[in-house]
């Protein structure tokens, strides 16, 4: 038989090119070899010298999956069901990285002879002992180090068992650093885009599709094959902490963006395609959070025990499903559906009318098996959100377990309930023992045949996401290609242009904008009180200039004297408050306080006297009402600074730039300023390019901006477009799809298609 393949050994990797067939790559250190058949080469992944179907790249993926799934032991399948806790690949000692640091031969990185791309002791243990093959990576030192670490992972597991590769995943990592500089033609560490709300503010599904395509290529160059995104929760509750990670509250827009995002990430083209749109540049999209997490009562978030209930006072549950069922599950790129789904932590209160069960979505047989799988025909991977099988010890801890509604069950029983609900995978769990205990519970209740079939059904789903992106043939990364791909100048350019398109001009009194370059600008410092981040880490009080002076100087002369300034810029953030107060608890209260979207202290005069949902083993009450209670924003000084700056500037132009994480009450300062720009996580340079007239604003509001907190209290958590909107002194209503360009209110095809009158 004529040989139809060639071989190259370089940098410890064997690369085999089959004529008109797959390119294979494996490590010289892993101990595997090749099998020859019909003149072609195949990886002998389990080192038995036999060309079994799962090794044969010529066969349909379904046959390969069936073969391998039936060979796996229950323990190996249980390992596939694990999705690791957060892994940091960095030498940084900041608080975030330190939380996820490992050891090297028992030593900290700086005390060992290891380099940052080596595997930690903990990683080696869960890869071998627990058969874990799905890893969530957070911060990485550099693209090249990420690629090397990925290769080290793949080489390590290649010589184990059946040679199943690792599926590395990531939460969104394309956010822009405000003070970084964009240089046309220059590359970067990764392309920089606006956050999800900013992508939504473009009202351009094709831009989002382009983002997915670019970000997917960058992910694969980093070794990442699964994206824990998009977050397509319909953001109908304006106070929600995760509002900025969504595409807003318009179901038609969110649905189209969901489709575009997933198609962009998942679709491979031409030579990169393996089959049906899937291939070597594809990234599995894990769409979240089923069945929609945007209706938490009073805006509280289910990462915390104080926010575990989603409510539906408007009876609008089904509309929250549409971004999934009409978007992520109806893709145009050939891959058909998002490869994975993540249910949210929330208890979707009183939505299970059949079983009358109020448990976290990942535990709900009705929401996962009956609704998602049976009614909507979804047979992809379902993965829990992180840590739902662990106990919670505090009401306000981000890192505590999220065992909502099943607190009385043992850890093994929780795993078992998740599996019976139709879920395949456990986010944030590194240990196989509880899954094996769940297997034994199933065997005792239903018999070995039933529970084994249940495990193999999940194995097939999980293996599909490895096969369809080509990891069995070539899981390795070329570091030189990584350097060329990640942060490529073309990608950086498109990301920067998307940032510019995402900026919304809300107010332009007397056409004060644009402001010609080389004028003199005054930018006051921001003042923030002490606070805590998501993880409970203390952030000290501070005063700081909100922009990099050198960046501003490229456009305008910067002065600290308002008298010398031609105009002023006030950089603000939307008000920051929490719906739970340890101080209130310490004073004998329940801890529940209102989340405020205004800068001045707020007292709830219209809040519910009885909450719609409540109850927790750590609480002796079930009424989570905050009626009559008060709260204040840690950044109230943002408003003070606007008032002070107006006094200092007299009648000279004052522009407010609001970094908006949530819809913000603007009536407190709108009449004091001449212009308002809304920023969704963009570089300062993008803002300056618009302020100076280099580009024209085109962003549109993907949500409503309320006139006052009373409107927020009256709206229903699950219903969109039910607030009275702010109307400015020019009589413009800050409603969904509103925005200005230099000539006035935008009325283009986007508004016609997605606006409230469409």
List PLM regions with ranges.
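Glycoside hydrolase catalytic-domain context in secreted enzymes
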Residues: 1-758
């Amino acid at each position: 038989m004529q040989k139809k393949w060639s071989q190259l050994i370089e940098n410890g990797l064997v690369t085999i090119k089959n004529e008109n067939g797959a390119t294979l790559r494996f490590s010289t250190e892993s101990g595997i070899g090749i099998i020859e058949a019909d003149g072609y080469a195949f990886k002998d992944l389990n080192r038995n010298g036999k060309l079994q179907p799962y090794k044969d790249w010529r066969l349909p993926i379904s046959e390969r999956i069936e073969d391998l799934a039936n060979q796996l032991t229950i323990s190996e399948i249980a390992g596939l069901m694990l999705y690791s806790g957060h892994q940091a690949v960095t030498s940084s000692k900041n608080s975030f990285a330190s939380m996820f640091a490992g050891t090297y031969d028992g030593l900290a990185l700086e005390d060992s002879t290891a380099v940052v791309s080596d595997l930690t002791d903990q990683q080696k243990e869960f890869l071998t002992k627990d058969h874990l093959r799905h890893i969530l990576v957070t911060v990485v030192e550099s693209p090249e180090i990420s690629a090397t670490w990925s290769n080290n992972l793949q080489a390590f597991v290649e010589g184990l068992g059946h040679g199943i590769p690792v599926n590395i995943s990531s939460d969104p990592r394309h956010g822009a650093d405000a003070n970084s500089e964009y240089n046309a033609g220059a590359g970067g560490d990764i392309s920089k885009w606006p956050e999800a709300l900013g992508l939504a503010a473009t009202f351009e599904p094709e831009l989002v599709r382009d983002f997915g395509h670019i970000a997917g290529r960058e992910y694969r160059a980093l070794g990442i094959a699964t994206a824990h995104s998009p977050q397509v929760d319909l953001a109908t509750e304006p106070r929600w902490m995760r509002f900025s990670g969504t595409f807003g509250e318009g179901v038609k827009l969110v649905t189209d963006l969901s489709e575009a995002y997933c198609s962009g990430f998942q679709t491979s083209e031409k030579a990169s395609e393996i089959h049906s749109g899937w291939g070597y540049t594809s990234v599995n999209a894990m769409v979240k959070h089923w069945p929609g997490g945007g209706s938490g009562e009073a805006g509280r978030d289910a990462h915390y025990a104080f926010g575990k209930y989603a409510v539906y006072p408007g009876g609008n549950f089904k509309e929250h499903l549409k971004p999934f069922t009409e978007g992520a599950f109806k893709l145009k790129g050939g891959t058909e559906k998002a490869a994975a789904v993540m249910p949210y932590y929330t208890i979707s209160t009183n939505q299970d009318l059949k079983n009358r069960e109020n448990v976290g979505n990942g535990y709900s047989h009705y929401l996962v098996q009956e609704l998602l799988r049976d009614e909507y025909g979804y047979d992809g991977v379902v993965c829990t959100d992180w840590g739902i099988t662990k106990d919670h010890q505090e009401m306000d801890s981000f890192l505590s377990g999220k065992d909502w509604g099943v607190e009385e069950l043992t850890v093994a029983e929780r795993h078992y309930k998740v599996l019976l609900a139709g879920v395949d995978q456990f986010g944030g769990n590194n240990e196989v023992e509880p899954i094996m205990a769940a297997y034994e519970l199933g065997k005792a209740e239903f018999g070995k045949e039933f529970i084994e079939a249940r495990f193999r059904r999940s194995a097939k789903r999980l293996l599909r996401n490895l096969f369809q992106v080509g990891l069995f043939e070539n899981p390795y990364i070329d570091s030189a290609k990584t350097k060329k791909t990640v942060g490529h100048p073309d990608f950086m350019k498109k990301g920067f242009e998307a940032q510019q398109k995402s900026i919304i001009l809300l107010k332009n009194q007397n056409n004060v904008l644009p402001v010609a370059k080389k004028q003199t600008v005054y930018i006051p410092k921001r003042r923030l009180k002490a606070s805590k981040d998501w993880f409970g880490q203390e952030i000290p009080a501070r005063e700081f200039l909100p922009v990099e002076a050198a960046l501003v100087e490229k456009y305008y002369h910067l002065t600290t004297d308002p008298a010398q300034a031609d105009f002023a810029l006030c950089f603000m953030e939307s008000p920051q408050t929490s719906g739970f107060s340890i101080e209130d608890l310490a004073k004998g209260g329940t801890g529940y306080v209102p989340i405020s979207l205004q800068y001045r202290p707020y007292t709830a005069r219209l809040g519910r006297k009885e909450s719609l949902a409540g109850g927790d083993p750590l609480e002796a009450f079930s009424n989570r009402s905050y009626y009559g209670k008060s709260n204040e924003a840690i950044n109230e000084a943002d408003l003070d600074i606007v008032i002070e700056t107006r006094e200092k500037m007299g009648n000279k132009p004052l522009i407010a730039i609001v970094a908006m994480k949530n819809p913000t009450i603007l009536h407190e300062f709108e009449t004091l300023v001449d212009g308002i720009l809304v920023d969704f996580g963009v570089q300062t340079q993008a803002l300056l390019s618009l302020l100076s007239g280099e580009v024209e604003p085109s962003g549109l509001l993907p949500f409503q901006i309320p006139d006052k907190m009373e409107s927020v209290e009256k709206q229903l958590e699950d219903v969109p477009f039910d607030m009275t909107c702010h109307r400015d002194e020019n009589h413009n209503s800050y409603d969904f799809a509103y925005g200005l360009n230099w000539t006035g209110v935008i009325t283009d095809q986007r508004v016609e298609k997605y606006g409230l009158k469409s």
